[in-house]
A protein has these predicted regions:
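Sec-dependent signal peptide recognition
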Residues: 1-10
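N-terminal signal peptide c-region/cleavage motif recognized by signal peptidases
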Residues: 14-17
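Extracytoplasmic substrate-binding proteins
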Residues: 20-21, 91-161, 179-184, 189-191, ...
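A short, structured surface patch at a secondary-structure boundary
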Residues: 21-85, 198
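Hydrophobic packing residues within well-ordered alpha-helices of enzyme cores
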Residues: 32-33, 91, 95, 169
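Alpha-helical, coiled-coil/dimerization segments enriched in small aliphatic residues
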Residues: 47-51, 59-60, 163-188
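Acidic/histidine-rich, surface-exposed loop or edge segments in extracytoplasmic proteins
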Residues: 53-58, 72-77, 98-103, 116, ...
Length: 202
């Protein structure tokens, strides 16, 4: 009887530590959870997670996608929800009133230290601290030494030129040792496929 009690207690503690499941509603948490969490820990992701241009090798192929709306999130109130609190303050307040565990991920790490702190935080939440620490160590050890004339970078998506002055993109460029291309592009549609396939008719 005593052995059974000890086993049950250990099983409960193990489940409590690693049984937490997550709903990701931001691109940042989509990417980092795909890197740090076990597949069974991720129950739903944002619509960004289906976009290979944003997710690269971490595209969501088998999880439902959710919009940041209360009705869509009601079935997931027992999960830990990652959401951009700055964009959806009212939704965050409503979720907290309903007892949901909300973790703000504002998608705007301004510095390397903020990015590394976020990675370590998610590593702790997912129970994967060792991998998170290794990832941070790897990023810190990178030595990006590019020729200065070649560091100007134009970022494109499938809908046009990416505004590289946004904080999240600035942090990425800084991490890679790159600088935004300073050319007077207009806000016209500039899809990447037109650059890669200039001779194709549209």
């Amino acid at each position: 009887m005593f052995k059974f009690f000890v086993f049950s207690t250990a099983l409960f503690l193990s489940f409590s530590s690693y049984g937490e499941q997550f709903v990701s509603l931001t691109l940042c948490s989509d990417r980092l959870l795909a890197e740090l969490a076990r597949p069974d820990q991720i129950v739903a992701q944002s619509s960004y997670s289906k976009n290979p241009l944003m997710m690269l090798d971490k595209v969501n192929t088998n999880k439902p996608t959710l919009e940041p709306q209360l009705t869509a999130l009601l079935p997931y109130l027992d999960k830990t929800i990652f959401i951009n609190e700055a964009f959806y303050p009212q939704l965050v307040e409503e979720l907290k009133k309903l007892g949901a565990k909300v973790i703000p991920v504002n998608d705007v790490p301004q510095t390397f230290d903020e990015l590394f702190a976020l990675i370590l935080k998610l590593g702790k939440i997912t129970g994967n601290e060792i991998h998170a620490e290794h990832l941070v160590k790897t990023l810190k050890s990178q030595n990006f030494t590019l020729n200065q004339p070649l560091t100007d970078t134009l970022m494109l998506s499938d809908t046009g030129v990416v505004e590289s002055n946004f904080p999240q993109y600035s942090a990425l460029l800084n991490l890679l040792g790159l600088t935004p291309l300073k050319m007077p592009f207009t806000a016209q549609n500039f899809p990447s496929k037109k650059c890669c396939l200039p001779n194709q008719m549209y």
